[in-house]
């Protein structure tokens, strides 16, 4: 279903395509653990454009391509003419002559959309300021591992900044029939257009999307609580001001207890700033879940690459 397609936003995927990614990711994870070769991208090359640095993204994509039998090329803005003013459309057309796929991690989402418009090979959004689809799909896989494959009717609560993770988690939950609630401070709400799109997606699967300023209200009945850093990359100058505003949104035991579910999971996409968005003792209690989540980025991204770039 996904062969030759871009993956820019979960909103653009069908429910079947989301399920296809998750199922293949689980299969590839099991094969990797069992030492069974799965060189689905033998002879293929992925270009990795990094305008925004990352530990997990680079390592997981690079290792993933190696395990699939292909190769990954790291391209920082210093390595590309993009950094010297070459139009994105020219870079896209040139790289399409050399590569079988392009992954990009950048700031403005419009840069990814323009790259995809002009590229003749699949483009994968590895993060923009608006969306983080690979991580949100990873979170779905992790929840499936702990809660079972049928996610319909479960509730995901997000507490913190209305950022790219909020947006992509909202889309992901809606696509698989999970109810979603986000709690953010006033002035830090998620993008209104994304919320409207997610509500439309949720209506199609019988789910709900709720936005509130009350973190205790958001987590009631939650099967999983997700949080993220209060100041994303590029917002370092706002750290102190944001910390003051977000302090009531820390994921601590008092908040987790409000879920009313002793089996409620806590997840974090990392890096985590313990004592800020998540209490140290809560992080350590759910460390196995959080690091399973980190590992699953590898398997989900392998599935995305295999489905979009493979034969």
Language-model features: where?
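A short, gly/pro- and small-residue-rich
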Residues: 113-128, 237-258, 285-287
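Positively charged, low-complexity intrinsically disordered leader regions
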Residues: 1-59, 63
């Amino acid at each position: 279903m996904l062969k030759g397609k871009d993956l820019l936003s979960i909103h653009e995927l069908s429910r079947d395509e989301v399920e296809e990614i998750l199922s293949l990711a689980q299969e590839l994870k099991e094969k990797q653990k069992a030492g069974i070769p799965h060189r689905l991208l033998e002879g293929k090359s992925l270009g990795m454009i990094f305008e925004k640095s990352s530990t997990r993204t680079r390592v997981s994509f690079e290792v993933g391509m190696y395990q699939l039998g292909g190769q990954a090329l790291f391209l920082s803005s210093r390595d590309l003419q993009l950094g010297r003013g070459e139009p994105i459309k020219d870079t896209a057309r040139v790289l399409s002559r050399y590569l079988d796929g392009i992954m990009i991690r950048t700031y403005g989402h419009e840069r990814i959309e323009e790259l995809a418009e002009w590229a003749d090979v699949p483009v994968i959004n590895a993060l923009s300021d608006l969306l983080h689809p690979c991580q949100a799909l990873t979170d779905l896989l992790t929840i499936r591992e702990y809660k079972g494959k049928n996610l319909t009717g479960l509730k995901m609560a997000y507490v913190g900044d209305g950022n790219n993770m909020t947006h992509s988690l909202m889309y992901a939950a809606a696509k698989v029939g999970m109810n979603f609630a986000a709690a953010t401070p006033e002035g830090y709400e998620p993008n209104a257009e994304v919320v409207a799109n997610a509500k439309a997606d949720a209506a199609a699967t019988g789910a709900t999307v709720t936005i509130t300023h009350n973190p205790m209200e958001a987590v009631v009945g939650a099967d999983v609580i997700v949080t993220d850093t209060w100041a994303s990359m590029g917002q370092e100058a706002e750290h102190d001001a944001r910390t003051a505003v977000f302090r009531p949104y820390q994921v601590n035991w008092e908040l987790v207890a409000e879920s009313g579910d002793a089996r409620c999971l806590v997840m974090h996409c990392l890096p985590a700033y313990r004592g800020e968005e998540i209490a140290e003792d809560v992080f350590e209690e759910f460390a196995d879940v959080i690091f399973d989540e980190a590992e699953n980025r590898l398997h989900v991204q392998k599935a995305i690459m295999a489905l979009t770039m493979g034969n």
